[in-house]
């Protein structure tokens, strides 16, 4: 009992300090991920004396945390916000990765004297942008759906090809001519598994009459984790499978969707905190100083040569303006993922892999501090920040099983064209009606002359048959205003 009490006490204290660190990081203008790493380093052998050097366990826990982070990222990504950036995001996560690996690897082969295998391993590991870092920074900037969508898709999708590249390079003596076919199979099969489990999982959850609201978020996350394991079992990309499944589930008509997203967000934060503290605990400060020079050389090549060149080449077919290209080039945020991937060659006994781990750790600290703290400034200087960008209306549903009906909860956001619309202008389908409006903490039954306002919350009772049409109509008016056509403007 004594040991578990100490472990629980230390774990809870670290978690509480990490939560407080979020507030501190905002005040200091630094990414909170750096503070989590710092907490882990302080807990380590050099300060508080906790010795932890198990690379296998670190990698296993790191992959588990990454699965949860990708789950949260996929669930909270709105399809309509990223669909216009889909192919740009795919290009950044494939073409840009290949260019970055080639350019970085070639440069480090000559600059650091690394053999080709190790040089390309450096390039592959450093090419992965971190989903946790990107999600935590971008969503508060207000740089527009196109850029945010492209970067979120890139960070969610590029783990798969990078992981495959690292595994292949770490076992370079086993690579055959079938390697490109293997890569294509892993990506295609991973995406297919994600789509199938996401679609069928959403259908099952809609039909499940679970006895408690809190079970829906648990079931949703479980489906996403199953997608990862299913992909891994058939030697497909589990990372791609979990992200695609989460994306499909997050954009499906799920019961208690708001509760699910809140749960996923909390789980994502827990995974981020645990992962970065763990990696900080694993790091050896005495070795990091020796890795400083090669890490900085790699950082300069990656930041000022490989990343910009890869962005330019990947975005050529999409006619991306130079300002957006500059922002995309500076937004390749690194975090825990490169460190976790760097452990793969170390575990497989590749010569020089320990130096790679140390250099990547240093580079993550430097790039996160520099890029993460300057990204808001750069976005403003490039004129990409839109302070008045409209936010999507929030619609949640709760099943009313005994009545054969559902309750839609609608929250009118800033910039929504629902503002100023009269109740009669909503023109909801037959079987749906606004039963209550909550405004400034007070609720009332709306009249035909009631005019909607920003921050109003509407409770709409609808039959199961009219539910989809009611939500489409609400989203249509949210986007196009009172004159949104019943047919043609769906809001999707």
Regions found by a protein language model. Give the residues of each.
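C-terminal end-of-chain micro-motif
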Residues: 1, 453, 490-492
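Transmembrane helical cores of multi-pass secondary ion antiporters/exchangers
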Residues: 1-388, 392, 401-402
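Sequence-level motif detector for i,i+2 pairs with an aromatic at +2
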Residues: 38, 405-407, 432
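Short, glycine/charged-rich beta-strand-loop motifs at protein surfaces that mediate ligand recognition
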Residues: 300, 408-413
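Short, solvent-exposed amphipathic alpha-helical segments in soluble enzyme
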Residues: 346, 383, 426-428, 451-453, ...
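Long, charged amphipathic helices and adjacent flexible linkers at domain junctions
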Residues: 387-410, 479-492
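Cytosolic Rossmann-like ligand/nucleotide-binding regulatory domains
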Residues: 414, 418-465, 470
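Surface-exposed interaction regions enriched in Ser/Thr/Asp/Glu
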Residues: 463-464, 468-483
